[in-house]
Amino acid sequence: MIQITPAAQAAIKGAIEGAGQPVAGLRLMVQSGGCAGLKYGMSLELTEAPDDLVVEAEGLRVLIDPQSGTYLNGVTIDFVTSLEGTGFVFDNPNAKGGCGCGKSFC
């Protein structure tokens, strides 16, 4: 369902270790926003919601709300450093298009 590259795994594990408290998992979500209509979001969660889809991906516990699940199926998450900046990149084979800034999709 979800692939997480070694670079993204290392960045996520570093964030979890630096959280200062136990976390239930990494929440992946799709939210309204951006110039193409939808954008990705991530957060460390202290608890999981009763309706969360819980996925073990590359040794990480990933929490996905039911509405975001359809958009995230097949996504690959990477962590890159380039001239444009450092951060997570989502490669979604199901996205129909994106925006010029690369921050949102439809």
Curated annotation (Swiss-Prot):
GO MF: 2 iron, 2 sulfur cluster binding; 4 iron, 4 sulfur cluster binding; iron ion binding
Signal sequence, renumbered to the chain: none
Stored SUPFAM superfamilies: HesB-like domain
Gene Ontology biological process terms from the UniProt entry: iron-sulfur cluster assembly
Protein name in UniProt: Uncharacterized protein in nifU 5'region
Family assignment from sequence similarity: Belongs to the HesB/IscA family.
